[in-house]
Amino acid sequence: MKNIEELILKAVELQSNGLVTGQIANELNVSRETVTWLLTRSKKDVVAPAPKDISVTWNSVGQSSYRLRCISQALCDMVIEKLERTQQDADLVIGIGLSGIPIATMMAEELEIDFAIFHDYDDQKGKTNQRGIFSRNFADVEGKKCIIVDDVVSSGATVTDVAEQLREVGATPIAVAVIVDKMNADMIANVPMSSLVRITRVD
């Protein structure tokens, strides 16, 4: 996306196609707050201050299985480096739907461990105050030592939800791996985070 006007048009288009705020945020790789601002900004008579956020577009990676594999291997290397320091081994890689799934799939293959999927509550057609769920069609997370994978971390809410639910079923989140970290954090939900790109906003 080249500018704010393009983001506004894309947000409005996605909303008209039936996507809810969280889904639009995932698609545009911005926070929910930014999506709300973009949608209200599309109404010309509304003036609100812009939220402090950054749109991330990584479709040049996502459209190529080769590039996805390279990114996944780099994330594996970073996670292994952190796990070796704490002498831990992972049993399972969890991909957060939608964009974390292809990366997590390749990471699980590279690490030769099981794979699971977490569906964020925003995938559940706009239901509010709902928690995400682990898919029953993939590996069981109970009692496992897990690596959580997503494309972009903006506020950390989804990763925190995953980590909390893992702990509730006796699993241990031992690492988080993302392409882009917009929080500029080493830890999220008391779990070490590795990212290929860390964004720091300087005002």
UniProtKB/Swiss-Prot annotation:
SUPFAM superfamilies: PRTase-like (SSF53271). It comes from Methanococcoides burtonii (strain DSM 6242 / NBRC 107633 / OCM 468 / ACE-M). InterPro entries: GfcR-like, PRibTrfase_dom, PRTase-like. Pfam families: Pribosyltran (PF00156). CDD domains: PRTases_typeI (cd06223). This is Transcriptional regulator GfcR. PANTHER family: OROTATE PHOSPHORIBOSYLTRANSFERASE, PYRE-LIKE PROTEIN. GO terms for biological process: pyrimidine nucleobase biosynthetic process; regulation of gene expression; UMP biosynthetic process.
